């Protein structure tokens, strides 16, 4: 999603300014490299790598090697941090021939979430036949597991007047891609000609205001994801801070913001799930998902259990008012604990810069 707004223009200006400075022989005191770890380089006295991390349970060997070029690393979830902190390999020093049995990232890794953003709502006109509809926002890919997401929905609601709005694309938001995506969806639904439930394809560019309108549409009752893994899960985060009930596996990046403190009967406060959990198994990623240097064949991610997924859909359908109440509590928690000023302060401190209360007043916050 690309938008020509103040924040985008500010980033473009800084990128252009930085490029011109480097071309003229300028030297940097510190580099913040926002890219995939394969591209990290030592280009300044202090170098900080910033990445979304990984959707599986371990990072690639090349990432471990490149992490040594950084002084600090910042990621966007505890799941991504776990991958950097706990992945180990057996390696050989190419210069000495020494075998390293515990080759790992030794650089400090900090997790800093995306911030909550207040976005004005723009009404989205959807021609939905039923009052109860689920929403899924994901690119059509192996990792997002859309085939099983759609198939499980249809199997569960083939005799019910329920809808699934699928905001998706295969590669981009072009007209050609829309035809390709529509064709894939039609083929997936062919075995169910007599179903009562309906699946709607929503394709194309949408602004942040329109997406907010989608999350707050009166006929959209919950967001569902059966993805194998997330580095963070931005659409899930957006849905949650808009007060939309969420159905998701209890694994990977999105669990950071789907839990909130809750008092038990004894008055003890514990972090509790504020979403409907899908049971899963951890297993090696599919061969079609292997990405050399990024997603290793021996890495694992979650495989949502289909029956658990379908029963989770049914739970929300049968008791949407209760789950909406839980979602509203999570919304308040996110808006407070993931507020922009808190996240920006945490991000700056992750770079080794101490931020006092007076300094935070000068932070530029893009709403």
Each predicted region: which residue ranges?
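Aromatic "clamp/platform" in nucleotide-sugar-dependent glycosyltransferases that forms part
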Residues: 228
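Donor nucleotide-sugar binding/catalytic pocket of nucleotide-sugar-dependent glycosyltransferases
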Residues: 72-121
